[in-house]
Amino acid sequence: MAVTFSDLHTERGLKTLEEHLAGKTYISGDQLSVDDVKVYAAVLENPGDGFPNASKWYDSVASHLAKSFPGKADGVRVGGGVAPPSEAHPHTEEPAADGDGDDDDDIDLFADETEDEKKAAEEREAAKKDTKKTKESGKSSVLLEVKPWDDETDMKKLEEAVRSVQMPGLTWGASKLVPVGYGIKKLTIMMTIVDDLVSVDNLIEDHLTSEPNNEYIQSVDIVAFNKI
């Protein structure tokens, strides 16, 4: 019976592979078959010590594949999606995986991808892009100084006006009132932003010092700006 593996770039998928390989040397028995090559292609890297069965299997398949291609490799990197099968290598019928007299050299490395394999390849690419995007989306800690119009400005409402500004990637933090002189106080307030989502200049010009918040806020200055 055919076995289906999915999400082999995730811990859940590797756990399924680990359980399947318990007591087995290869995917479909004690001999390497095209099934192993297909699953191997869907695993991003050696699963590691957390998956001993899968890790041992991965190294074994890698060793067999290396022996199948004795030529010296300089090492290459391939970008983009999965390429369609080359016309120079037409699809051939896969031998039945009966385990009797199978030869590693007979494995068809150029067989057409199944729907599950295409889906797995797409999921791997999506996972890589999500990981890259997460790494690139840094955060910053910003300290703002918010000044009122005069000593008659209601500072409680001023702070409420500041915190009323909400947008994706913006989190308001601690604040305090600092005396300036002549009965006037200013508000200092911390905020954390996701750099790719929030522009501090836009936040100040288009939200904090524009209507209706400019009824309480005269100006806003950046006191400190630090990457997290």
From Swiss-Prot:
Entry-linked InterPro entries: eEF-1beta-like_sf, EF1B_bsu/dsu, EF1B_bsu/dsu_GNE, Glutathione-S-Trfase_C_sf, Transl_elong_EF1B/ribsomal_bS6, Transl_elong_EF1B_B/D_CS
Membrane-related topology note: Peripheral membrane protein
Keywords assigned: Acetylation, Cell membrane, Elongation factor, Membrane, Protein biosynthesis
CDD domains per UniProt: EF1B
Comp. bias regions, Acidic residues: 95-115
Domain of life, source organism: Eukaryota
GO molecular function, a single term: translation elongation factor activity
GST C-terminal domain sequence ranges: 14-65
UniProt modified residues of type N-acetylalanine: 2
GO cellular component terms listed in the entry, alphabetical order: cytosol; eukaryotic translation elongation factor 1 complex; plasma membrane; plastid
Cell compartment(s), UniProt: Cell membrane
Region Disordered: start-end pairs: 75-139
Comp. bias (Basic and acidic residues): 116-138
Cysteine disulfide partners in this protein: none
Chief location: membrane
Family of this protein: Belongs to the EF-1-beta/EF-1-delta family.
Function, in words: EF-1-beta and EF-1-delta stimulate the exchange of GDP bound to EF-1-alpha to GTP.
Quaternary structure, from the entry: EF-1 is composed of 4 subunits: alpha, beta (1B-alpha=beta'), delta (1B-beta), and gamma (1B-gamma).
Protein name: Elongation factor 1-beta 1
